[in-house]
Regions:
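A general structural signal for well-ordered secondary-structure junctions
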Residues: 28, 63, 183, 255-258
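Pocket-edge structural micro-motifs
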Residues: 31, 100-101, 264
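PAPS-dependent sulfotransferase catalytic domain
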Residues: 56, 63, 85-212
């Protein structure tokens, strides 16, 4: 019987670090992974096949990856066939597999429909640090003439674009978690950086059989800044919405941290 673990989280939120850790622990993440680049020196650990599927769904909806609202996906027969083929192949070939792609936040119900027993590990980072990192990436790419300039400029022409994206993705995580609390675990990037025993927690909760690997075996402290920044949000209503979502994410991650205390008492 095959088991699945999906890694979900907004862009620049620590999902690559998390996926790298889980890969070392024995989670199969795909045959073809997105390679390292100047914004992610150790690689994204991102399944290109899944990334392309999500990109196609967004394109069919007239969108790109800069999503700022709930997506009502249009799934063509061709895309359904590709998803079904991927699921059948992976379930046949791997006892435990999963994938990581920030876009999956927008499509978690689709994957839950295809994989009813799948578990979701949701990783979040505070909005100020996450959006700062995203803007920094696009500033670097813009000045190195890498990728479409219109996309890079959009983050500076509309300063609230990145926070709106952060809100849309993390809201979808919370919606999924509210419907499937037993199949969702929420952690913060801070927890992982502070040596929370993530692999142990996953095995304890879902008995996945991962090798118990410490984050320090794969974590490069220089690769992810821990500098705290002020909120970049200009619109007060948006700031209030983001604050509410952050508080709920913090509550759920606190529940995950509480596993340590429960484990000590057991």
């Amino acid at each position: 019987m095959s088991e699945q673990l999906i890694v979900a989280g907004f862009h620049r939120s620590g999902t690559s670090l998390t996926a790298q850790l889980l890969s070392h622990a024995g989670l199969f993440l795909g045959e073809w992974l997105l390679e390292e680049d100047q914004s992610n020196r150790y690689g994204h650990f991102e399944d290109v096949e899944v990334k392309n599927l999500h990109g196609q769904i967004l394109s069919d909806c007239g969108l790109d990856w800069r999503v700022t609202d709930t997506v009502l996906p249009v799934i063509t027969d061709r895309v359904w066939s590709r998803i079904e083929a991927l699921v059948e192949r992976r379930c046949t070939e791997h006892r435990l597999w999963g994938f990581k792609d920030p876009r999956v936040c927008l499509f978690l119900p689709i994957w839950k429909y295809m994989l009813p027993d799948a578990k979701v590990l949701a990783v979040y980072r505070n909005v100020a640090d996450s959006t700062h990192s995203l803007k920094k990436r696009h500033s670097t790419q813009m000045f190195s003439n890498s990728g479409p300039n219109a996309v890079h400029r959009s983050f500076f022409e509309d300063p609230d674009l990145a926070p709106r994206m952060w809100l849309a993705h993390n809201r979808e995580i919370l919606t999924f978690a509210s419907h499937y609390p037993e199949d969702t675990m929420v952690v913060s990037l801070d927890m992982i950086q502070d040596a929370f025993p993530l692999v142990w927690a996953l095995n304890k909760r879902w008995r996945l059989g991962l090798r118990d690997v410490s984050a320090f075996e794969v974590f490069d402290a220089q690769a992810t800044s821990r500098e705290r920044r002020e909120s970049p949000i200009r619109n007060e209503d948006l700031a209030d919405e983001v604050d509410a979502v952050e508080r709920e994410l913090e509550r759920l991650s606190s529940n995950t941290e509480a596993m340590l205390t429960i484990g000590d008492q057991a």
